[in-house]
A protein has these predicted regions:
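Hydrophobic, aromatic-rich transmembrane alpha-helices
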Residues: 2, 114-116, 204-208, 323, ...
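Loop-to-helix entry region of an early transmembrane alpha helix in multi-pass inner-membrane enzymes
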Residues: 16, 73, 77-81, 91-114, ...
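Short helix- or helix-capping micro-motifs
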Residues: 19-22, 129-141, 158, 165, ...
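Extracytosolic helix-loop segments that constitute the early lumenal/periplasmic catalytic or substrate-binding loops
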Residues: 24, 28-36, 44-71, 78, ...
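Transmembrane-helix motifs of polytopic, lipid-linked glycan transferases
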Residues: 100-124, 161-165, 354-358
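Membrane-interface transmembrane helices that cradle and orient dolichyl/undecaprenyl
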Residues: 123-127, 155, 163-181, 185, ...
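Membrane-interface alpha helices of multi-pass inner-membrane proteins
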Residues: 132, 166, 178-193, 203-204, ...
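Membrane-proximal stem/loop segments at transmembrane-domain junctions that anchor or position
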Residues: 241, 247-322
Length: 424
């Protein structure tokens, strides 16, 4: 009986359904507190909702700020098209569309349990896999974000950990067709969230080192993956070149994000008006057009960084704290918080940092071969956000990898014992 219970607890199917139940419970509880008119509009008052509405109305990939400002490359294409399909089916800016989008987010987030379970099983053992799955089932950001953000965050988390799982499987079965599927999958992932590409070189290096074949054959496989990923993205890149007469591989908004994190509002000695309003920026965007607007913001951001190197480093340090703690002043916010949920999330973030560090140490000591691909997620993926803007939403794609590392830290004694036994 005890053995059956243990097997049940280690079942990825059970973990998935519990994870889905928790996310749906949070979704419906929180949605019940919000007026229906707000649910129908507020979650979509962002760039994704604006472009999706334009697509659903047959206007094309445009109108990024709810105004007729013409074509845009501000966003990667997959999630706006996905949301547009929901709008087309259930109506633009309706309560039903909100629930449909949030429900899909919950499913995406719960599905993370499957590839996460198998990644942990590959590195550790079944106890590690079960621990990783259960950690993800209750992971605060995994429960909260599907409701809070109608964005690609939950889908990106699923794709990010699926890429790690696919990488591990490719090392075990290096047939040519698997590399073809892997390259195509990478192309799709980049069209969902280009930031995932930051870990691609490290995963490819690991595959090159792990597959057993000649150097020439290994290089051919890696080149095939890269070419196929580029091929998948190429139609969108061509579309951007036709519309904007610029080389924009997937999305264009990085200069604006860089400026948002590096501008005179952060300088206490600046004589400029220390505020940024959405109205003013949208008005400027409408005046200049997307490319000129982004060039202006990029130039301003670079000039600010050049003139304020010390302040830039200080801001980057604050963003490092913010992306891992959810706020640049975690202790003060913990004391001021009037919500037990907010305090719990801050406390969980501390445990996540400690567990991630301990997990990396565990991998280095006991499973060193897996260090490169696993460490790329917490160490490389967030780097771009240290320069721009940060939030737990932006870190979310690497959260499943953090759950994996936390599980490795928790099951460290068993893994170390097994390693010594194998060595003996």
């Amino acid at each position: 009986m005890n053995f059956r219970f243990q097997r049940l607890l280690a079942s990825p199917s059970l973990i998935f359904f519990v994870a889905l139940f928790l996310r749906l419970t949070f979704l419906f509880y929180e949605a019940h507190q919000v007026p229906a008119t707000a649910l129908a509009t507020v979650p979509f008052q962002n760039e994704v909702g604006s472009v999706a509405a334009a697509l659903a109305q047959g206007q094309g990939f445009c109108c990024v700020f709810h105004q007729p400002t013409g074509p845009t490359a501000w966003l990667a294409p997959v999630y706006p098209f996905f949301l547009a399909a929901i709008f087309k089916t259930f109506g633009s800016f309706t309560v039903v569309s909100f629930y449909a989008a949030a429900l899909f987010n919950c499913v995406f987030s719960a599905l993370v349990c499957w590839p996460l379970f198998h990644c942990a099983l590959r590195i550790g053992n079944r106890t590690t896999a079960a621990a990783a799955g259960w950690l993800w089932a209750v992971f605060p950001s995994g429960v909260v974000i599907p409701f809070e953000w109608i964005w690609d965050s939950s889908l990106s988390a699923l794709l990010a950990i699926s890429l790690l799982w696919a990488t591990f499987r490719l090392a075990d079965d290096s047939r040519r067709r698997n590399f073809i599927f892997y390259g195509l999958f990478w192309g799709f992932c980049l069209l969902v969230n280009p930031a995932l590409g930051s870990v691609l070189p490290f995963l490819l290096i690991w595959i090159y080192l792990r597959i057993g074949s000649s150097d020439r054959r290994r290089l051919a496989h890696i080149a095939l993956v890269i070419c196929l990923a580029i091929l998948v993205c190429l139609p969108w890149t061509i579309r951007n070149a036709v519309q904007f007469h610029r080389f924009i591989p997937i999305r264009s908004d990085f200069p604006f994000e860089l400026w948002m994190g590096n501008n005179p509002i952060y300088d206490p000695h600046s004589r400029q008006l220390n505020r940024i309003t959405r109205y003013e920026e949208v008005h400027r965007y409408s005046q200049l057009g997307e490319i000129a607007f982004l060039e202006e913001k990029g130039t301003a951001a670079k000039e600010f960084i050049r003139q304020h190197p010390a302040l830039t480093l200080q801001l980057a340090a604050r963003r490092v704290v913010a992306i891992w703690m959810g706020t640049p002043a975690p202790w003060q916010d913990f004391q001021r918080a009037d919500s037990n949920l907010a305090r719990f999330i801050l406390g969980w973030n501390v445990l996540t940092i400690l567990g991630t560090a301990a997990g990396l140490a565990c991998v280095f000591i006991v499973r060193r071969w897996f260090l490169l691909p696993v460490a790329a997620y917490p160490l490389v993926f967030p780097l771009v956000y240290y320069l721009t803007q940060v939030s737990l939403r932006l870190r979310h794609p690497c959260d499943p990898a953090l759950a994996l590392l936390m599980a490795l830290a928790i099951t460290w004694p068993w893994l170390r014992t097994a390693a010594h036994a194998n060595a003996g």
